[in-house]
């Protein structure tokens, strides 16, 4: 039986055992509704995506089928199917079934399927354990308040993985900006994040759109991130 079928059987058994799941709709406050209507649909959808459910799994066994890799969390029996669309497709073409990976999952689409479908973001587990964080990187946020002035705030961004994907980095940085700097409360215009490495190389995330799918599986060395700069316009 394939891994996917085993996982679905486990999920079905769980539903039969626990019974139906019910949800209760919560009213939206007038102030929240006003905030949501102040931006375009595209910006609203960006905020919804970057504040949506995400899952950070460690040391899961992967099983490859074509350009997809399947993982099942042994505790919750949750099936995760990762679509390879970029450099990870070539990198993992000779992957051996049962290899251990860390997996960062963000559900894609609006399906209510019990399976978590995601794109990219498979990386090697850390080579050793760390008591605290692996690295604290300086995060500088410059926010434009008028045509000739801006506020600047500095803080730290925690790096916990030796090998980290652009998908995870982009998602967690945007979530921090939403929580602490009102990202997507207004239109992001040409706002961007720049991640600079020790050797001068850099990676840019444009905040007026999602990270491109072909970049989601790209991984970089988390130990060599020098600084992160954000421009909010």
Q: Predicted regions span which residues?
A:
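Sec-dependent N-terminal signal peptides of Gram-positive bacterial secreted proteins and lipoproteins
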Residues: 1-30
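N-terminal functional modules and adjacent low-complexity/disordered segments of proteins
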Residues: 6-11, 41, 50, 227
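N-terminal, intrinsically disordered, polar/charged segments of Gram-positive cell-envelope systems
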Residues: 27-109
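Mature extracytoplasmic domains of secretory-pathway proteins
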Residues: 72-88, 132-198
């Amino acid at each position: 039986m394939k891994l996917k079928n085993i996982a679905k059987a486990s999920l079905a058994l769980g539903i039969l055992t626990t019974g139906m799941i019910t949800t209760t709709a919560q009213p939206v406050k007038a102030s929240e509704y006003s905030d949501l209507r102040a931006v375009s649909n595209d910006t609203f959808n960006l905020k919804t995506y970057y504040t949506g459910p995400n899952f950070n799994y460690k040391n899961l066994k992967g099983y490859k089928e074509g350009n997809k890799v399947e993982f099942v969390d042994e505790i919750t029996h949750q099936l995760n199917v990762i679509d390879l669309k970029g450099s990870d497709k070539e990198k993992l073409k000779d992957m051996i079934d049962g290899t251990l990976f860390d997996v960062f999952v963000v559900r894609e689409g609006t399906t209510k399927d019990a399976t978590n479908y995601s794109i990219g973001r498979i990386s090697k587990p850390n080579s050793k354990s760390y008591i605290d964080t692996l690295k604290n990187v300086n995060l500088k946020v410059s926010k434009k308040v008028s045509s000739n002035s801006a506020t600047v705030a500095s803080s730290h961004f925690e790096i916990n993985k030796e090998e980290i994907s652009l998908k995870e980095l982009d998602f967690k940085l945007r979530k921090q900006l939403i929580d602490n700097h009102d990202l997507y409360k207004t239109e992001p215009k040409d706002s961007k994040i720049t991640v600079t490495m020790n050797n001068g190389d850099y990676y840019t995330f444009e905040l007026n759109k999602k990270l491109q799918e072909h970049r989601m599986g790209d991984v970089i060395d988390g130990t060599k991130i020098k600084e992160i700069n954000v421009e909010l316009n």
